[in-house]
């Protein structure tokens, strides 16, 4: 069997690759009883004293490298910061590894590095180490970022802890990142204002936690979109999730173009959103806090967790249907 791009596009195919090839061949996958690789959460943890170091890594290859709303540099910082933030951690520092193709435009490289700098300042996260390689074996720049954060011991927020009755909240309009990439890459003749939502969301999440909101589970709906994130949360938590079609925040533009192209916005990648499972009693206050922040102005309560069924069910005007985990992200090379 040959590896295809689908194996790195989120969804069922990537999950199978990770479990059947990678996990089964690695034996030491956690430290000091912390959250390890086998959990397949957004980050791992290393307990030290009364704290836990939260650690994650992300590789980024996107085509085009500059797109409406962002670029590969902003994407690299945001993706890693967000993986730390959805664990309830305070992001502290990043590493930066660049694999640059021979012949790459120097002005483009400087533009990317400046974007990395601006995004790290926005997130208030330092870039403290790195590595640079120039290669004739790649066709475009690849950026890998590792990140560390900190959280009180035992307070990391897992994606496997959704509780019955929890409100399911998404922090804003979905589908924008993947669609912005697709339209920019393929040159569709659409007049559109769609831009990627790529942004660090650590300050948004921090605000919710500071207010004492009980978040039982969190995930950022990147590759595979909202459908992938909700299915992972439901499966790992051994619970069902019901969502309501008319509550899911989607801009008219995104919905219209998805309809034209035959795409499901639930499966399209986001890079500046968070999905939260929040204690029912805290849900309305959580929504208020999110909407006070520019990155959460379109936040909505989209459903609830239930033991009445497994998996993810969506209620529509014509009835109920199952929301499956996608086979893979319908738009390759988005992150």
From Swiss-Prot:
InterPro entries: HypE, PurM-like_C_dom, PurM-like_C_sf, PurM-like_N, PurM-like_N_sf. Pfam families: AIRS (PF00586), AIRS_C (PF02769). Transmembrane segments: none annotated. One of its GO terms (biological process) is protein maturation. Belongs to the HypE family. PANTHER family: CARBAMOYL DEHYDRATASE HYPE, HYDROGENASE ISOENZYMES FORMATION PROTEIN HYPE. This is Putative hydrogenase expression/formation protein MJ0676. It comes from Methanocaldococcus jannaschii (strain ATCC 43067 / DSM 2661 / JAL-1 / JCM 10045 / NBRC 100440) (Methanococcus jannaschii).
């Amino acid at each position: 069997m040959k590896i295809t791009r689908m194996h790195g596009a989120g969804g069922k195919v990537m999950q199978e690759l990770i479990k059947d090839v990678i996990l089964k061949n690695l034996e030491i996958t956690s430290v000091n009883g912390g959250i390890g690789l086998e959990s397949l959460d957004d980050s791992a943890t290393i307990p030290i004293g009364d704290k836990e170091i939260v650690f994650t890594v992300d590789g980024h290859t996107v085509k085009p490298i500059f797109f409406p709303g962002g670029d590969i540099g902003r994407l690299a910082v945001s993706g890693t910061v967000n993986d730390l933030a959805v664990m309830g951690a305070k992001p502290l520092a990043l590493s930066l590894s660049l694999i640059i193709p021979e012949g790459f435009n120097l002005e483009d490289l400087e533009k990317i590095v400046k974007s990395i700098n601006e995004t790290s300042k926005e997130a208030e996260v330092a870039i403290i180490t790195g590595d640079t390689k120039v290669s004739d074996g790649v066709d475009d720049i690849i950026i890998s970022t590792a990140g560390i954060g900190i959280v009180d011991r035992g307070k990391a927020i897992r994606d496997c802890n959704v509780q019955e009755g929890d409100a399911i909240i998404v922090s804003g309009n979905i589908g924008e990142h993947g669609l912005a990439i697709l339209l920019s890459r393929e040159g569709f003749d659409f007049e559109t204002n769609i831009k990627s939502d790529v942004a660090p969301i650590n300050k948004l999440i921090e605000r919710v936690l500071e207010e004492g909101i009980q978040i039982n589970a969190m995930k950022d709906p990147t590759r595979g979109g909202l459908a992938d994130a909700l299915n992972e949360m439901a499966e790992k938590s051994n619970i069902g999730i019901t969502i309501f079609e008319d509550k899911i925040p989607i801009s008219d533009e995104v919905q219209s173009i998805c309809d034209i192209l035959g795409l499901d916005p639930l499966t399209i990648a986001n890079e500046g959103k968070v999905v939260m499972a929040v204690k029912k009693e805290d849900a309305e206050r959580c929504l208020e806090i999110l909407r006070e922040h520019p990155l959460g102005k379109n936040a909505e309560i989209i459903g609830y967790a239930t033991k009445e069924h497994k998996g993810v069910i969506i209620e529509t005007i014509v009835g109920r249907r199952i929301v499956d985990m996608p086979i893979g992200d319908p738009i390759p090379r988005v992150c």
